[in-house]
């Protein structure tokens, strides 16, 4: 019984150690895989930039095909499958992630790729997106925007994916250099075929380095230890040849010279354009100074005119107040004079009343002249003397001078 228990205990310990070893091995493999993909992506970007100095990059360029394969492998690294109704996971393309995570990019091409007629599968749409983003020079912006949406990235990828690790920031940075390249792609070519996955060609980036402890050269070691059949698969034969013929060097020199001439012409054109723009800028600056001076002068004139108008308004207000005070003073003076001289007003009123009374008396006695007759006759005068005691008759002199008592 004791031996059985010890055996079971040792077996359980051995099983636990084996499980820990498997986890560490899988973690190492995942780290190596991530490091390999990021390194190959850096190499592919560098070779793509170097090739763009000599020719236009299109679908036939092997450097671009290798870069597209590397980027597709990176975006598909540890991508979760799509769960069906029956609980099974179906394979998913990285386009499903890009379509959701890159919606926030301004003026994105997501809808255009979704509406393409000759592209049906998700893998083909993802490859078309890579080409369109490179032609638009926005691939780095798409990747950066997608990586910032950590919630969506976490939903589409498993733990240990490149887009969830520290390598993601390196990926967005190295893709930024591709914005300086002019790409030309045909979105109806064979490169968009989504039937087969992309395969990375590692041979352009492999280089055999001789150890410092080795005595013989690499060629002697390969001839000694390798056969004729195996020599064809050595890195020497697979990679670029070490010695190039004279024609190849001449062609490369010719291309470099043509590139130099083109660059020199572009440099002269840009310098001439720069001088023209500098002249235009100096003219604009001088015109701007003149306009600013005019604006300052007009502002100063407006301020002076405003001050003058305000001064005139103040003067007019003072004059108006003085006139109002004079009118009020004249009214007070007239009232005071009327209150100080009441006899004059009473005499005027009495004269007016007497005149009115005389007129009324004359109108009340219209037959008086007929009874008295003419004032020139003696009889009339005698008859008038007898009536002197009456107050209503005036004196003969008054009657003679009065216009109303003229003889008929």
UniProtKB/Swiss-Prot annotation:
InterPro entries the UniProt entry points to: Run_dom, Run_dom_sf, RUN_RUNDC3B, RUNDC3A_B
Compositionally biased intervals (Polar residues): 225-236
Region (Disordered): 1-25, 213-238, 337-359
Pfam families reported for this sequence: RUN
Coiled-coil stretches noted in the UniProt entry, renumbered to this chain: 301-326
Modified residues (Omega-N-methylarginine): 13
Keywords from the UniProt entry: Coiled coil, Methylation, Phosphoprotein
SMART domains associated with the record: RUN
Gene3D superfamilies (alphabetical): 1.20.58.900
Domain RUN as annotated: residue spans: 58-190
Oligomer status and interactors: Interacts with RAP2A.
Name the UniProt record assigns to this protein: RUN domain-containing protein 3B
């Amino acid at each position: 019984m004791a031996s059985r228990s010890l055996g079971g205990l040792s077996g359980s310990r051995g099983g636990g150690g084996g499980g820990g070893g498997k986890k560490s091995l899988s973690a190492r493999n995942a780290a190596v895989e991530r490091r390999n993909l990021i390194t190959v992506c850096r190499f592919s970007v560098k070779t793509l930039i170097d090739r763009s100095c000599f020719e236009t990059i299109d679908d036939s360029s092997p450097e671009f095909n290798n870069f597209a394969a590397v980027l597709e492998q990176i975006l598909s690294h540890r991508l979760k499958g799509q769960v069906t109704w029956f609980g099974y996971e179906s394979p998913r393309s990285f386009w499903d992630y890009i379509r959701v995570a890159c919606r926030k990019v301004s003026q994105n091409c997501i809808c255009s790729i979704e509406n393409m007629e000759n592209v049906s599968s998700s893998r083909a749409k993802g490859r078309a997106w890579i080409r369109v983003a490179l032609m638009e020079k926005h691939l780095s912006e798409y990747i950066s925007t997608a990586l910032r949406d950590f919630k969506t990235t976490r939903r589409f990828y498993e733990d240990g994916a490149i887009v969830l690790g520290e390598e993601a920031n390196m990926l967005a940075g190295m893709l930024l250099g591709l914005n300086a390249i002019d790409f030309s792609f045909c979105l109806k070519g064979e490169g968009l075929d989504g039937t087969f996955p992309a395969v990375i060609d590692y041979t352009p980036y492999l280089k055999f380095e001789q150890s410092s402890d080795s005595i013989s050269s690499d060629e002697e070691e390969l001839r000694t230890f390798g056969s004729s059949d195996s020599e064809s698969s050595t890195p020497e034969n697979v990679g670029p040849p070490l010695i190039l013929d004279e024609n190849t060097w001449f062609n490369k020199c010719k291309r470099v010279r043509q590139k130099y001439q083109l660059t020199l012409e572009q440099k002269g054109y840009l310098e001439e354009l720069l001088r023209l723009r500098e002249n235009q800028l100096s003219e604009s600056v001088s015109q701007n100074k003149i306009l600013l001076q005019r604006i300052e002068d007009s502002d100063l004139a407006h301020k002076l005119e405003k001050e003058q108008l305000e001064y005139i308004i103040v003067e007019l207000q003072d004059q108006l107040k003085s006139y109002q005070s004079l009118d009020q003073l004249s009214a007070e003076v007239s009232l005071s004079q009327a209150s100080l001289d009441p006899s004059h007003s009473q005499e005027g009123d009495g004269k007016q009343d007497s005149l009115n009374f005389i007129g009324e008396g004359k109108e009340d006695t219209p037959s008086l002249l007929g009874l008295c007759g003419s004032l020139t006759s003696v009889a009339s005068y005698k008859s008038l003397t007898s009536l002197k005691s009456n107050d209503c008759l005036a004196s003969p002199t008054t009657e003679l001078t009065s216009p109303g008592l003229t003889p008929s």
